[in-house]
Amino acid sequence: MNLRKVGGIIAVANHEVAKPLLQVGQIPIIRRIVITYQQVGVFPIVVVVGGDDEDLKRELSSLGVIFLKHEQERMPELMDSVRTGLQYLQGKCSRVVFAPVNVPMFTPDTLQSLLDTEGDVVVPSWQGRGGHPIVLTDEMIPKVLAYSGENGLRGALEDLPRTWVDVDDKGILANAHDEEELNRQLTAHNLSIVHPALHMKLEQEEPFFSARLKLLLYLIDDTNNMRTACARSGVSHSKAWDMINRLERCLGYSVVERQRGGKSGGSTRLTPQGADFLAAYQEFEQAVHQFTQNEFKKRFILTKIIE
């Protein structure tokens, strides 16, 4: 299932060290990264957590991210979280962007510059210092996963062909452990994430398709298991079926096929029509996103109405 060109990973894992819900301005740092990813069209976005973090799920529930639970719940290292995210996205995207949650202040323009640069591993640099996020191709994922040394992510990337991109963005280095620095960058970062916020839905007499249901169908197609799809999307089992049943009533055909029983406990998968619907919606969403970004840039950024 290679539906998108760029997938994203945000490593949270060690909640105490990472501080994903640290408020900088009016929003938590993890929300800043999700917004930045979404502005350049990253999907799916995978958040790697170290346990059942209900507060985090509530914070991100409306943003359509995938929650992956790390097996080593207590004190996973950064590389462990990277590995979990890469294992999930391998084969699903042509490129993957990664950032630890405690580096939240890089801008959408910086990320777009990295994505516009060809290279197996693309790393931003500010005044000679490398930072985050890091972009790598799907072909590099097996090499990162195969690393077994003691130097973590740095060691895994050390022998890979890296392309450095100079950026005028100190946010690639700003760390949540230095809250004063985050706050110094706040005004500039808030300006960088000004964007047209389209919360797309399909409606009939009432809304019947949203970002949450899009993600749920994506995960059903990926896992063929409703409970796993619900756990990874942060949607309750009963709510998931309510949304699917409403969608099927409005469309007039089955979107999800239920197979009960058997040694495996049954499975859930998209019907051919359901898969076609999801693919068409994603293509539609991409086209609307690109059009909106272009119009916003033309009417507000290039005219310097917003600077």
Where are these regions (language model features)?
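N-terminal glycine-rich phosphate-binding loop and ensuing alpha1 helix
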Residues: 2-54
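Conserved beta-loop-beta/alpha segment of the NTase-like Rossmann-fold superfamily
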Residues: 71-142
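Conserved alpha/beta core of the MobA/IspD/sugar-nucleotide pyrophosphorylase nucleotidyltransferase superfamily
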Residues: 148-197
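Short helix-boundary/capping micro-motifs
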Residues: 223-229
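Key DNA-contact positions within bacterial/archaeal DNA-binding proteins
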Residues: 227, 238-239
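Residues within the DNA-recognition helix of helix-turn-helix
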Residues: 243
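A short LG(V/I)-centered, amphipathic sequence patch enriched
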Residues: 249-269
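Helix-turn-helix/homeodomain-like alpha-helical modules used for DNA recognition
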Residues: 275-307
